[in-house]
Amino acid sequence: MQEKTLTESIDAALSSIGEASRTTQPEIELRENGVVTTVLNGIALIRGLPGVGYEELVEMSGGVYGIAFNVDPDEVGVVLLGEYAKLQAGGRARRTGRVMDVPVGDGLLGRVVNPLGRPLDAEGEPRFSGRLPIERPSPGIMDRNAVSTPLQTGLKVVDAIVPIGRGQRELILGDRQTGKTAIAVATILNQKGRNVICIYCAIGQRASAVAKVLAQLREHGAMAHTVAVVTEGNDPSGLQYIAPYAATSIGEYFMEQGRDVLIVYDDLTNHARAYRELSLLLKRPPGREAFPGDIFYVHSRLLERSTHLRKELGGGSLTALPIIETEAQNISAYIPTNLISITDGQIYLSPTLFELGNLPAVDIGKSVSRVGGKAQLAAYRSVTGRLKLAYAQFEELENFARFGTRLDEASRKAITHGERIRECLKQDELDVLGVEEQILILLSLSEGQFDPLELSEVSGAMKRLSAAARELPRDLLERLHSDRPLSDEDRRRLLQTAEAALQKKRTAGRL
């Protein structure tokens, strides 16, 4: 009896195994596994991954990731991302079958993250809506719209002389410690309440410098509309290299939703150096200044992603402010000339003007905006044309007067007027002004109302004009912010307001 029961149990078990084998389809997955042969200064050399693709993400022992940069038949050169101290030769490596991507979404607003999307602000993991590749093709020609809307920086010299439009790429360049980052930060602060998303991308910056910028943004309430993507100087070169691409993908997410985005790359000099270091370690042929031959393409494919999309695609825009550091005022060096040719204009900051206290130290003669003028508000165009000409004449006469030449009355008046223009274009760091304040000051300046004042009185006069501008009638404010030129009646009302504000000081002085 027991034998029969045992036999039946065995038969039933074998039958179930047979049935399972007929219905079960085993899943076989082929994976390429390689071996790390060399780890050196932020790169790794791997053997045994013959099918890996260019810029494919590679996972190595200890959870270290890298991007395949050199794809040779026998060996793959991988740029390491993140901490790699525990990675050693002999470690395992495998393909992931995907490219590097970054988390995107509204949950990143107000956060400080690294290019991998990992938080640096001790506020926990950020909420995100999805992921986008860090390398994306730039919009086609037929997907773009003309730059037609101004992006106000809050700085008189920029908004009046070298205006920036939404979707433009405006280079900021100058020697170290001349106020390049200050202009970019002021522009971010001025977007508060203007429905513009801002992205600050720090590339290989000192931790103290980044902390200062973030403190300024928080102090002025600008972090609510800002995402900070940060790499420090001690981060691996690979992480510094991907930082601007990751930040741009975050910005493109908002742009494709029809929103306006401003992105600051601080700075692309460090980015170029990081790419040069990686290329030399991977034994790529060096070119001019030891940079690899494709350094122009590295930056052009990044900046071409900034644009103003046509209405059918949402009408969003991505405005780029790349920053470049020059050496000894040499703007004809390799990287600066590359960026000047890629961008739509440049703002050059002169160390000479900086040392003289003319802040922001914008050299008007070497600064230009190739497309922003078409986006500038009409009220600016009504007042800045004469200012540019007067200032150019003043600079020429000032150089001439240094030789001790006696000047006629007209020349002396031109110098007096030019000195007031230069004084009016000065602005304290992060002290941004609204459109109505700038236009009232510039109109009063162009009409010579500042000429009777002493230079020491100009700063106080501008403050009184700013206060008066904030009290202008609503209908006049709306016209100043519109694209309609100033009418004769508008000019008369503005000049009366300016004269009344300036008269207060004179009356107070007589009393």
Swiss-Prot record:
One of its GO terms (molecular function) is ADP binding. Belongs to the ATPase alpha/beta chains family. It comes from Chlorobium luteolum (strain DSM 273 / BCRC 81028 / 2530) (Pelodictyon luteolum). The record marks 367 as: Required for activity. Its main location: membrane. Disulfide bonds: none annotated. It catalyses: ATP + H2O + 4 H(+)(in) = ADP + phosphate + 5 H(+)(out). Produces ATP from ADP in the presence of a proton gradient across the membrane. The alpha chain is a regulatory subunit. It is a peripheral membrane protein. It is found in: Cell inner membrane. F-type ATPases have 2 components, CF(1) - the catalytic core - and CF(0) - the membrane proton channel. CF(1) has five subunits: alpha(3), beta(3), gamma(1), delta(1), epsilon(1). CF(0) has four main subunits: a(1), b(1), b'(1) and c(9-12). Keywords: ATP synthesis, ATP-binding, Cell inner membrane, Cell membrane, CF(1), Hydrogen ion transport, Ion transport, Membrane, Nucleotide-binding, Translocase, Transport. InterPro entries: Alt_ATP_synth_F1_asu, ATP_synth_asu-like_sf, ATP_synth_asu_C, ATP_synth_asu_C_sf, ATP_synth_F1_a_nt-bd_dom, ATP_synth_F1_asu, ATPase_a/bsu_AS, ATPase_F1/V1/A1_a/bsu_N. ATP binds at residues 174-181. This is ATP synthase subunit alpha 1. One of its GO terms (cellular component) is plasma membrane. Its EC number is 7.1.2.2. The keyword Aminoacyl-tRNA synthetase does not apply.
